[in-house]
């Protein structure tokens, strides 16, 4: 493990970062710049440490859209997709099936949950209402990406478990070029 890519600073996406870094001390932790404030002691309540275990950690790198993260044969492109959190980040990369040579375009949206854009949540957290518009604009931008395999930041985002049950005998049960646009439209 050389890099720990965090999609956003909610406990279920960053709560294990320090543990992972303990297993791989050389690994660099990445996070969207606009989510760094979640990690400040005065804002850690937004991660719900009273309900979920959270060990503070240091971020080594912030994502830059103009700088892919290169890991072996992968170049992972990052996209700022504010909404679920201000620094929510989405990922895009290509993978080649070595047996067939076919290139698959893969993407994961960092946080599709609209629960954080409700009036009540925004008031409670002090986050700006402008996140709603940023979310819409980022979804329009991402929707245009050609994606063969949509990866959900939670299994239900892409019906991942149901797809595995239904299409598990296929080489790529998650391959569905229409799914990314459907996800963006929902």
Describe every region a protein language model picked out.
Residues 15, 19-23, 56-117, 137:
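Catalytic core of the metallo-beta-lactamase
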Residues 1-10, 29-32, 80-82, 108-110, ...:
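Active-site neighborhood of phospho(di)ester-bond hydrolases with catalytic His/Asp-centered motifs
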Residues 1-68, 170, 183:
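Active-site HxH/HxHxD metal-binding segment of metal-dependent hydrolases
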Residues 1, 24-28, 74-75, 103, ...:
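Loop/turn elements at helix/coil->beta-strand transitions in domains of secreted/extracellular proteins
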